[in-house]
Amino acid sequence: MGGHSHWAGIKHKKALLDSKRGKVFTRIIREITIAAKMGGAELENNPRLRKAVEDAKAANMPADNIKRAIMKGTGQLEGATYEEITYEGYGPSSIAVIVDCTTDNKNRTFSEIRKIFTSRGGSIGTTGCVSYMFKKKGLIIINKETISEESLMDIAIEAGADDIKSESEVHEVFTAPESLDIVKKALEEKGVKTESATLTMIPDTETEITDENAAQSIMKMMDELDDHDDTKAVYSNYNIPDEIMEKISK
């Protein structure tokens, strides 16, 4: 299905392209802290921490900031205690929405995320109310200018990837969650430069939005959720046709 879906192409580059560098740094620091807390400070033995540190370096984060975040996670330095929490619910036109957050105050975060849902005509539901509509996948983004789809297909499938999809500017390589790091390494060993590699939630089916007002409400809600300080990632199952996106983007 053509059009603009929340998990396609451009959204995956948001963290590295976001002009609000302070917000990007905050999110990465929280991820480093949690990863170090859960899996220890050794990058070789902690894939999640290794990925977070790679993201930090790609965003030009100073090495001292990275080191301090790791030390806070392992308890060597004092700092805020962050928890991971996921909210599920429905947005405009009954689209399914999942919001992953990291927070040092669950009550505050819940109140603020709920307000975004309700202000756009949506509602937060109970755990599991929409997540069954999605599958967790590893996703690797590769610039289309660096390799052809055919060449990438051969390398990626041999490396253990599940599927490949080419968007307008990037190739998307999908993997099982546990295979993400392995496939990424295998691609890079073959000389394939990856732009990002992350875990994501892919909807089983998409809801096509053909009404301009509904599309506008959805995009405003997505932007507000994306921009919230505690938000780590937002997933949804909407698909807005390109012609509608062009109209509401003017």
UniProtKB/Swiss-Prot annotation:
It comes from the Bacteria. GO terms for biological process: regulation of DNA-templated transcription. One of its GO terms (cellular component) is cytosol. HAMAP family: Transcrip_reg_TACO1 (MF_00693). It comes from Elusimicrobium minutum (strain Pei191). It is found in: Cytoplasm. Its main location: cytoplasm. Coiled coil: none annotated. The keyword Transcription regulation applies. This is Probable transcriptional regulatory protein Emin_1151. Pfam families: TACO1_YebC_N, Transcrip_reg. Signal peptide: none annotated. Keywords: Cytoplasm, DNA-binding, Transcription, Transcription regulation. InterPro entries: Integrase-like_N, TACO1_YebC-like_2nd/3rd_dom, TACO1_YebC_N, Transcrip_reg_TACO1-like, Transcrip_reg_TACO1-like_dom3, YebC-like. GO terms for molecular function: DNA binding. Belongs to the TACO1 family. PANTHER family: TRANSCRIPTIONAL REGULATORY PROTEIN YEBC-RELATED, TRANSLATIONAL ACTIVATOR OF CYTOCHROME C OXIDASE 1.
